[in-house]
A protein has these predicted regions:
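S-adenosyl-L-methionine-dependent methyltransferase catalytic core, i.e., the SAM/SAH-binding region
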Residues: 152-155, 163-167, 171-173
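Glycine-rich, histidine-containing beta strand-loop boundary motifs that form or position
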Residues: 27-29, 62, 168
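Short loop/turn segments at secondary-structure transitions that flank enzyme active sites
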Residues: 31, 138-139, 170-171
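Conserved small/polar residues in nucleotide/adenosyl-binding loops
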Residues: 175-177
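Active-site histidine-anchored catalytic micro-motif
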Residues: 1-45
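Structural beta-sheet core signal
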Residues: 25-27, 132, 164-166
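Long, well-ordered, tryptophan-enriched scaffold segments
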Residues: 34-126, 131-132, 137-161
Length: 177
């Protein structure tokens, strides 16, 4: 409904074909439109594809409850933003698959996994490029706005120019993408 893992793999292949070396993935786990514990399979497949291609690392992972809010619950969105931009979270695990399994062991399903830092070098920073391949605008607007809108005021954050590409129009007011 929101995206497909084959699109991620095609983007990773494109990055490899273009010789990109610093490719980081910020994984948003679903748990609503698919099984609430299917995230471990997607994360496993992604880690395997990174190894196979020799490109890409999972920098962060989190449930859609944080990254894909649509009701201006800025505390949730800020937690996602802080993980992706500042590399800050109460949860750090360099092994993405283990991070998901740890959440399951604690009774937390994909949708509600709090942001986890898997690779602190993968933060989004000045002049980075971001490809957001979510196809449902309603769940993508808020996190997008935090990254591209200089007038965003939902919480205090550092604004910096990011080249941001998305796969559909999220909002006519988001003129920076």
């Amino acid at each position: 409904v929101h995206s497909h893992i084959d699109h991620l793999f095609a983007l990773m292949q494109m990055a490899k074909d273009r010789g990109l070396e610093r490719v980081y993935i910020h994984a948003f786990l679903d748990g609503r439109d698919v099984s609430p514990t299917s995230g471990v399979d997607y994360v496993t497949r992604t880690v395997e594809k990174c190894r196979e291609l020799g490109v890409g690392k999972i920098a962060t992972l989190m449930g859609r409850y944080y990254a894909m809010d649509r009701d201006k619950r800025w505390d949730r969105v800020e937690a996602a933003y802080d993980a992706m931009v500042y590399g800050e979270s109460a949860h750090v695990n360099p092994l993405p698959v283990a991070a998901v399994k740890d959440a399951y062991a604690a009774g937390v399903t994909d949708e509600f996994i709090e942001p986890v830092i898997c690779d602190g070098d993968g933060t989004i920073s000045d002049n980075d490029s971001v490809i957001f391949f979510n196809y449902r605008p309603d769940r993508a607007r808020e996190i997008t706005r935090t990254l591209v809108d200089p007038k965003f005021d939902g919480f205090t954050r550092q604004y910096f120019p990011v080249t941001f590409v998305c796969t559909t129009e999220y909002d006519l007011s988001l003129i920076h993408i």
